Amino acid sequence: MSAIVDIIGREVLDSRGNPTVECDVLLESGVMGRAAVPSGASTGSREAIELRDGDKSRYLGKGVLKAVEHINTEISEAIMGLDASEQAFLDRTLIDLDGTENKSRLGANAMLAVSMAVAKAAAEEAGLPLYRYFGGSGAMQMPVPMMNIVNGGAHANNSLDIQEFMVMPVSATSFREALRCGAEVFHALKKILADKGMSTAVGDEGGFAPNFSSNEECLNTIVQAVEKAGYRMGEDVLLALDCAASEFYHEAEDVYVLEGEGLKLSSTQFADYLANLCDKFPIVSIEDGMAEGDWDGWKTLTDKLGKRVQLVGDDLFVTNTKILKEGIDKGIGNSILIKINQIGTLTETFAAIEMAKRAGYTAVISHRSGETEDSTIADIAVGTNAGQIKTGSLSRSDRISKYNQLLRIEEDLGDIASYPGKSAFYNLR
């Protein structure tokens, strides 16, 4: 038995300089697991609640001392002595202890830090790499990365309404090759922007954040960068978008307002707008193409593009099996974004991935805009054979830490490692 003998919660900083929760879990054998949780900028309204102190005299109210206190007192008392290898039982203990639908009492940030730290300690105790502990002997598929090389929306202070413009290397035969492709495109884009006198400052997720006149101009510039780096757009590299449409949806008027382009569009018109972009560019994936509450708009978008484009629900599904099941039943989207802090425990995270796969939906493992050096999501991506990961651009060590962990995992897997390329989109025609 891997009995838990000590738990320590602490307040640390994330990549935006805001407080977040870190937890150490010590086992009877002397083995320790440590985990730190991320935080989002554009968040879904039905996400599990991240507990903040609200004390304006500390960190502008964003302190997490209450969440840390919960770890060091009642959570510690509830799980002390439990077997760290019984992840599902431990997570259920946390959920029952919290007692709310959205984890608002203890805080999803406190609960997730403990859930992750316990898993890491148990993996260490078992002498297994974390991805192998999660996935057993069947974990061998590396993920295709969605690399966010241009940031807009809530992730940057510029004129772009769409939040993320991403490249996906699909012709590579290994993750290492895919990472090199992304890095070379990133540097080619930097040179193009610099030559045009445009900003090469980066946003929260490490992508560039220049002012473009339109989303099309941005996409055209990315195409130039791909070609400048020596790759074929549409063959070697595909494009992906995160619209984060909830951020520019005006519910009272039922319109999508693209301020950067001076457009006010109905759901149907915005679906047509996105379809037009897909006709002009090799876009294989669109995340949050409609607002989280606009299910009619989502249905319109799915009917229009769902057979040829991966339509990823982030704010829509918030890694929640109840909401995902409703979406599956109604034929909304065809993919789910998996963010561990949206739901607050590893067990519930794995349940959402499993439900998606059973329904023929893809699952994309994702970071948050406020990250830490914790690289657990890299191990989750491989451990669940998810096939796709979204963890930022090719700059900022809070993003690179995940890519570097994936390089280590691929090296550890050796000849049995596989890279899915275009087959990651197994539900598209």
Swiss-Prot record:
<keyword id="KW-0964">Secreted</keyword>
<comment type="pathway">
    <text>Carbohydrate degradation; glycolysis; pyruvate from D-glyceraldehyde 3-phosphate: step 4/5.</text>
</comment>
<comment type="similarity">
    <text>Belongs to the enolase family.</text>
</comment>
<feature type="active site" description="Proton acceptor">
    <location>
        <position position="339"/>
    </location>
</feature>
<dbReference type="InterPro" id="IPR036849">
    <property type="entry name" value="Enolase-like_C_sf"/>
</dbReference>
<dbReference type="GO" id="GO:0004634">
    <property type="term" value="F:phosphopyruvate hydratase activity"/>
</dbReference>
<dbReference type="GO" id="GO:0006096">
    <property type="term" value="P:glycolytic process"/>
</dbReference>
<dbReference type="GO" id="GO:0009986">
    <property type="term" value="C:cell surface"/>
</dbReference>
<feature type="binding site">
    <location>
        <position position="163"/>
    </location>
    <ligand>
        <name>(2R)-2-phosphoglycerate</name>
    </ligand>
</feature>
<protein>
    <recommendedName>
        <fullName>Enolase</fullName>
        <ecNumber>4.2.1.11</ecNumber>
    </recommendedName>
</protein>
<dbReference type="InterPro" id="IPR029017">
    <property type="entry name" value="Enolase-like_N"/>
</dbReference>
<dbReference type="GO" id="GO:0000015">
    <property type="term" value="C:phosphopyruvate hydratase complex"/>
</dbReference>
<dbReference type="InterPro" id="IPR020809">
    <property type="entry name" value="Enolase_CS"/>
</dbReference>
<dbReference type="Pfam" id="PF00113">
    <property type="entry name" value="Enolase_C"/>
</dbReference>
<dbReference type="GO" id="GO:0000287">
    <property type="term" value="F:magnesium ion binding"/>
</dbReference>
<feature type="binding site">
    <location>
        <position position="242"/>
    </location>
    <ligand>
        <name>Mg(2+)</name>
    </ligand>
</feature>
<keyword id="KW-0324">Glycolysis</keyword>
<dbReference type="Pfam" id="PF03952">
    <property type="entry name" value="Enolase_N"/>
</dbReference>
<feature type="binding site">
    <location>
        <position position="369"/>
    </location>
    <ligand>
        <name>(2R)-2-phosphoglycerate</name>
    </ligand>
</feature>
<keyword id="KW-0479">Metal-binding</keyword>
<comment type="function">
    <text>Catalyzes the reversible conversion of 2-phosphoglycerate (2-PG) into phosphoenolpyruvate (PEP). It is essential for the degradation of carbohydrates via glycolysis.</text>
</comment>
<feature type="binding site">
    <location>
        <position position="390"/>
    </location>
    <ligand>
        <name>(2R)-2-phosphoglycerate</name>
    </ligand>
</feature>
<keyword id="KW-0460">Magnesium</keyword>
<feature type="active site" description="Proton donor">
    <location>
        <position position="205"/>
    </location>
</feature>
<feature type="binding site">
    <location>
        <position position="368"/>
    </location>
    <ligand>
        <name>(2R)-2-phosphoglycerate</name>
    </ligand>
</feature>
<dbReference type="InterPro" id="IPR020810">
    <property type="entry name" value="Enolase_C"/>
</dbReference>
<dbReference type="InterPro" id="IPR000941">
    <property type="entry name" value="Enolase"/>
</dbReference>
<keyword id="KW-0456">Lyase</keyword>
<feature type="binding site">
    <location>
        <position position="287"/>
    </location>
    <ligand>
        <name>Mg(2+)</name>
    </ligand>
</feature>
<dbReference type="InterPro" id="IPR020811">
    <property type="entry name" value="Enolase_N"/>
</dbReference>
<feature type="binding site">
    <location>
        <position position="339"/>
    </location>
    <ligand>
        <name>(2R)-2-phosphoglycerate</name>
    </ligand>
</feature>
<feature type="binding site">
    <location>
        <position position="314"/>
    </location>
    <ligand>
        <name>Mg(2+)</name>
    </ligand>
</feature>
<keyword id="KW-0963">Cytoplasm</keyword>
<dbReference type="GO" id="GO:0005576">
    <property type="term" value="C:extracellular region"/>
</dbReference>
